[in-house]
């Protein structure tokens, strides 16, 4: 009965996404109900992965015409090179290609030089086109070449200097993470008549290259992949039959009606009101779904779990080809086996 370790835990049925003012950048993600303590466990793990492990794009180096190092200045440009480099760190990119690319920027004064002045390449999009890089005086010209790449986390400038870097190439500290801020809160919530559950609320802000909803999904997938190595057993079989005897792909006991399970009147009425007719209908329900049934409480849940356990079944199982089209005929056909 090892499956009880995970199959009988309450799980959130779905995520609730509450978009912020800019839905592509800000959202609140709500998951409930969770077993007590799981809000903190999952919230902390997701936050750390969101901030550290998602792939994004950034400018990794710049080469400006007639500039030998970052402590130089460019005639007619109000900012010195150090300030230009700092402003380049604020350019937000989206790259749909894996290989590093080079972009160019050419501008003439007077006026502001913005991220939108960067000439985009195939598969690369500048997201914050109004971001100011520098200001040019009358008659001033600025020409630069930018190296952009995909990566994760933070990479210091010295790591972005190629071994064969030409004179004048200035490496830049790269912040690849598309996630800017993550906070979470765990509060009590109820499920049916039970109050002792967690509600996880996460506020996620990205740079726009990735939606908050996708960011959370990718972080969860990373955690899932990392934990898979710790699972040292095969999943127990679902409610199917490998020999497919009598032409069925599932246990014929699932065709038995729930009103034959000798449940209490209260439990039986709750199942009836929820249109649960056969055992096959019942075992596909999760605990969370059952507790949302009107007038269905923990006592009824425990009663049903005990009855199913005696049959080698449990809530939350998958059933192949259920319900069959001719379910009533099949139920009559196998009635003598019950």
Swiss-Prot record:
Keywords: DNA-directed RNA polymerase, Nucleotidyltransferase, Transcription, Transferase. Its EC number is 2.7.7.6. Residues 250-338 are annotated as: Alpha C-terminal domain (alpha-CTD). One of its GO terms (molecular function) is DNA binding. CDD domains: RNAP_alpha_NTD. InterPro entries: DNA-dir_RNA_pol_insert, DNA-dir_RNA_pol_RpoA/D/Rpb3, DNA-dir_RpoA, RBP11-like, RNAP_asu_C, RNApol_insert_sf. Residues 1-234 are annotated as: Alpha N-terminal domain (alpha-NTD). GO terms for cellular component: cytoplasm; DNA-directed RNA polymerase complex. It catalyses: RNA(n) + a ribonucleoside 5'-triphosphate = RNA(n+1) + diphosphate. SUPFAM superfamilies: C-terminal domain of RNA polymerase alpha subunit, Insert subdomain of RNA polymerase alpha subunit, RBP11-like subunits of RNA polymerase. One of its GO terms (biological process) is DNA-templated transcription. It holds the Pfam family RNA_pol_L. Gene3D superfamilies: 5' to 3' exonuclease, C-terminal subdomain (1.10.150.20), DNA-directed RNA polymerase, insert domain (2.170.120.12), RNA polymerase, RBP11-like subunit (3.30.1360.10). Homodimer. The RNAP catalytic core consists of 2 alpha, 1 beta, 1 beta' and 1 omega subunit. When a sigma factor is associated with the core the holoenzyme is formed, which can initiate transcription. HAMAP family: RNApol_bact_RpoA. The N-terminal domain is essential for RNAP assembly and basal transcription, whereas the C-terminal domain is involved in interaction with transcriptional regulators and with upstream promoter elements. Belongs to the RNA polymerase alpha chain family. DNA-dependent RNA polymerase catalyzes the transcription of DNA into RNA using the four ribonucleoside triphosphates as substrates. This is DNA-directed RNA polymerase subunit alpha. It comes from Paracoccus denitrificans (strain Pd 1222).
């Amino acid at each position: 009965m090892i499956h009880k370790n995970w199959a009988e835990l309450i799980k959130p049925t779905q995520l609730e996404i509450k978009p912020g003012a800019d839905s592509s950048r800000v959202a609140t993600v709500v998951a409930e109900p969770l077993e007590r303590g799981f809000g903190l466990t999952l919230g902390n793990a997701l936050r750390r992965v969101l901030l550290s492990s998602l792939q994004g794009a950034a400018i990794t180096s710049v080469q400006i015409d007639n500039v030998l190092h970052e402590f130089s200045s460019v005639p007619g440009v109000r900012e010195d090179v150090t300030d230009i480099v700092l402003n380049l760190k604020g350019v937000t990119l989206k790259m749909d290609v894996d290989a590093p690319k080079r972009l160019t920027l050419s501008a003439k004064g007077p006026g502001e030089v913005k991220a939108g002045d960067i000439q985009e390449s195939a598969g690369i999009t500048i997201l914050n086109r109004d971001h100011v890089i520098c200001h040019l005086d009358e008659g001033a010209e600025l020409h630069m070449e930018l190296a952009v790449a995909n990566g994760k986390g933070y990479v210091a400038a010295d790591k972005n200097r190629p071994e064969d870097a030409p004179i004048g190439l200035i490496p830049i500290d790269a912040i690849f993470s598309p996630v800017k801020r993550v906070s979470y809160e765990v509060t009590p919530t109820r499920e049916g008549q039970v109050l002792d559950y967690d509600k996880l609320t996460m506020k996620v802000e990205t740079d726009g290259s990735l939606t908050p909803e996708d960011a959370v999904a990718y972080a969860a997938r990373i955690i899932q992949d990392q934990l898979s190595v710790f699972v040292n057993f095969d999943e127990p079989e679902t409610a199917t039959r490998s020999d497919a005897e009598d032409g069925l792909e599932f246990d014929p006991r699932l065709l038995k009606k729930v009103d034959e399970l000798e449940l209490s009147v209260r439990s039986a009425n709750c199942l009836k009101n929820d249109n649960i007719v056969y055992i096959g209908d019942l075992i596909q329900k999760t605990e969370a779904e059952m507790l949302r049934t009107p007038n269905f409480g923990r006592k009824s849940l425990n009663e049903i779990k005990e009855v199913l356990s005696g049959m080698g079944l449990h809530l939350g199982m998958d059933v192949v080809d259920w319900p069959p089209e001719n379910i009533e005929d099949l139920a009559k056909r196998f009635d003598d086996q019950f």
